[in-house]
Amino acid sequence: MSYTFDWLSKDVVKKLQGRDLRPVKCLSDATKFCLFNILQETSSRLALKTEYIPVGFTLLHLLEPNIPVPEPEVSAPIPLKHTISQKLKADLDVETIAGGEAGFVKSCGYDIEVQSKSIPNPKLESLQNRKLLDQLPTFMKTCWKDGKNLYVVTEAYEVTKDTVLEGTSNSKFAIKGIINQLVKVGGSGQWQTEKTDSIPIQKGSVLAYKKQQLVIEDNTCVILTSANTKKKMTFPMRFVGMSGHLRYQDLVIETGSWINDIDPIGTIKEPTHLDFMCLQNEVSEQTRLLAELSKDVQEVVFSSFLHMLCDRDVLYDLMKMLELNQLGHMDGPGGKILDELRKDSSLSWINLKDLILYLLQALMVLSDTQLCLLALSVEMRLLPHQVELVKSILQPNFKYPWNIPFTLQPQLLAPLQGEGLAITYELLEECGLKMELNNPRSTWDLEAKMPLSALYGSLSFLQQLSEA
């Protein structure tokens, strides 16, 4: 378990148990999920939830001026407190090795107070069917063209006073008889890290939110106020891209060639039935396209991601820039990836931006601990073995919604001895599986399905890049 803002917001959502309540992923965006803020959905992927990122505008920025703005309803403060400690430690018996130990010890707690600010459906009526401004922000052009839906925040749980999230973690590996790849010490290897996190969270930061979809037709904006309402696209019609400022009347198509390219207004395609083969085929196709990129491009992408893996904020910022189609300036390794995208040197049938987004979206599902363990796994060349192990868990259990005991295959565990085994078990435990280093048995948990799928995709991508 990694103790970060992301972990805090997810834990708060579990405690509040609100229907359709979603956690805010990143502290840097905690003030961008307030009431009326507009969110754009990310590209959809199999077995991964669609995420929602703020576009930097509120609904009030899009509507005609001087409209009545409904007053939010504010709940009484809700105190939330949580303390947790976690330990994963065991002596290891490793073939041809005299012995050793590995373990993780972590502790964390928080004591916060939140309150809900919401606009209930009856109050939203004053905003329904309002005229849009004549000139709309250019981000709407991209969303219309790409078929991305937009949403508005209608409820937000805010922190009522400044607070600090604190946590400590201790990771230790000690293996006799081998030379650790991280710290070389004579005939034995030892790696130990101790980390204390202190994350200040300002008053007004949003930890969780609810959203409702926008539908834009005939120069007006509608907020879908019922979960039972038949889903529509935000932009029921596609358009030919225009440059400069976007005017609503410019979105009317001047040719009739688009008519056969869209579904009837108000319809939505049924999703493909998900099974592991669908996920495997999707990951295989993406890694195949990745392999067709030039070695130079793959090396730049791999090196850049390796330097960013332990920094969720940088990964998230890069994902936002790509989702919002903003290839602006970015320092560090993320900037190198943007440079490659600007070159547009990839083969015409390969969309480098989509490939990078695929990996970013998978990584953002994982915890901070997993991100750092992935970097360590790359250094220790564990990826091929980890891919097969995760696949062996997903393949037989993917379709089951209930808890099923399973046993990890000995032949897949054999290459993952010592540190490799402890690192891999921690990756699995962070997905929600209960793991013990001396026990290959565990139990399938439906809540582990999504993080395991994201881990499978991340490992597969990084493995392909590492082999370039």
From Swiss-Prot:
The keyword Membrane applies. Residues 1-230 are annotated as: Triggers pyroptosis. Keywords: Cell membrane, Cytoplasm, Lipoprotein, Membrane, Necrosis, Palmitate, Transmembrane, Transmembrane beta strand. The gene is Gsdmc. Cleavage by CASP8 relieves autoinhibition by releasing the N-terminal moiety (Gasdermin-C, N-terminal) that initiates pyroptosis. Palmitoylated. One of its GO terms (cellular component) is cytosol. Intramolecular interactions between N- and C-terminal domains are important for autoinhibition in the absence of activation signal. The intrinsic pyroptosis-inducing activity is carried by the N-terminal domain. It comes from Mus musculus (Mouse). It comes from the Eukaryota. This is Gasdermin-C. GO terms for biological process: programmed cell death. Belongs to the gasdermin family.
